């Protein structure tokens, strides 16, 4: 099988060493495809030039190719079986025009809870959309979505053998939507230290919760990538996951990252059918489902209970399950096969 993994214009490198959910997913698919025995071409100028030593890198984007051009003919003659792309592309006319000339499948994963696809973007066979959670399946029901847990990998982020850490960790972008202040309060209730890892996206949000964020039990780490990011997760006793009431998580990378590192998770959710429910089980974490009408303090106390529950789990067992559940080879094989 010949697979093309397409980049897109953005602020992160391909592959990124840290953040960038779609970029990390595309890299995981490329890694999984090659490990599964497929031939892989990295398509687009965004892929790191250093990869040319080990990968076939072609700096071409389908949406930039003219009808009847030599570039179109060369792409068609290459004979791709599958293209893997960011979720917007099957709804972009310039991209789909070129793709239709190639006689191959396309697969993508929905990383946004709000993007509106065209009515003809997916048929469930030649063009396939994959979604992480029951919540996302319901949101995109008109496009014949297929349930699947996304795998996200970064460059040089190989996980060490699992060990039981000591401090709590929260990782992600720091803003209102991700609501780390609830994790900080839950840690405070338990008398535990918590490390906050990630870039600040909203300074006003941080100022609103300054008393919590400046408390003695909070350690600000900043944005990490590569081995340092992996170590921050692996060295924790529990990964604490939060988000705001109205926010819909399309396919959080942190579930796979934490479980693959052997760190159990304590997740706060405001409804059933979320990514946390799809990703976790009793052996890998604890999910606190809180009525969104409840106050933050109630949510923090429920989350604190979940942290204590998750802390009793076996880290080596968590890692074993995580490596299987979020295996890039399994993920690629699921996405490369048409439904029966």
Pin down the residues of each PLM region.
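Conserved donor-binding/catalytic core segment of Leloir-type glycosyltransferases
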Residues: 130, 146-197
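Donor nucleotide-sugar binding/catalytic pocket of nucleotide-sugar-dependent glycosyltransferases
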Residues: 105-116, 125-159
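Acidic donor-binding loop of glycosyltransferase active sites
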Residues: 234-250, 263
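Nucleotide-sugar-dependent
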Residues: 15, 243-256, 268-277
């Amino acid at each position: 099988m010949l697979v093309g993994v397409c980049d897109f214009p953005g602020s992160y490198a391909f592959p990124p060493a840290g953040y960038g959910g779609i970029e990390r997913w595309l890299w995981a698919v490329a890694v999984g495809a090659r490990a599964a025995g497929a031939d892989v071409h990295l398509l687009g100028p965004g892929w790191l030039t250093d990869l040319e030593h080990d990968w076939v890198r072609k700096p071409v984007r389908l949406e930039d190719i003219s009808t009847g051009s030599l570039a179109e003919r060369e792409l068609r003659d290459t004979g791709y079986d599958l293209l893997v792309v960011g979720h917007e592309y099957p709804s972009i006319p310039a991209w789909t025009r070129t793709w239709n000339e190639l006689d191959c499948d396309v697969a993508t994963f929905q990383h946004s809870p709000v993007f509106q696809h065209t009515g003809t973007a997916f048929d469930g066979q030649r063009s396939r959309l994959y979604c992480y959670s029951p919540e996302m399946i319901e949101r995109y029901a008109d496009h014949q979505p297929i349930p699947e847990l996304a795998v996200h990998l970064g460059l040089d982020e190989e996980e060490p053998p699992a060990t039981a850490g000591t401090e709590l960790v929260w990782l992600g972008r720091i803003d209102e939507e991700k609501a780390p202040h609830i994790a900080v309060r839950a840690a405070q209730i338990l008398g535990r230290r918590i490390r906050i890892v990630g870039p600040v996206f909203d300074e006003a949000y941080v100022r609103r919760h300054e008393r919590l964020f400046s408390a003695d039990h909070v350690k600000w780490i900043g944005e990490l990538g590569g081995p340092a990011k992996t170590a921050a997760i692996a060295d924790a006793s529990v990964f604490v996951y939060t988000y705001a009431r109205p926010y819909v998580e399309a396919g959080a990378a942190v579930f796979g990252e934490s479980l693959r590192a052997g760190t159990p998770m304590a997740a706060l959710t405001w409804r059933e059918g979320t990514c946390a429910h799809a990703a976790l089980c009793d052996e890998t974490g604890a999910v606190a489902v809180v009525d969104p009408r409840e106050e933050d303090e109630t949510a923090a106390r429920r989350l604190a209970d979940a942290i204590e529950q998750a802390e009793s789990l076996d880290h080596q067992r968590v890692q074993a399950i995580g490596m299987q559940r979020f295996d890039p080879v399994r993920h690629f094989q699921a996405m490369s096969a048409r439904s029966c």
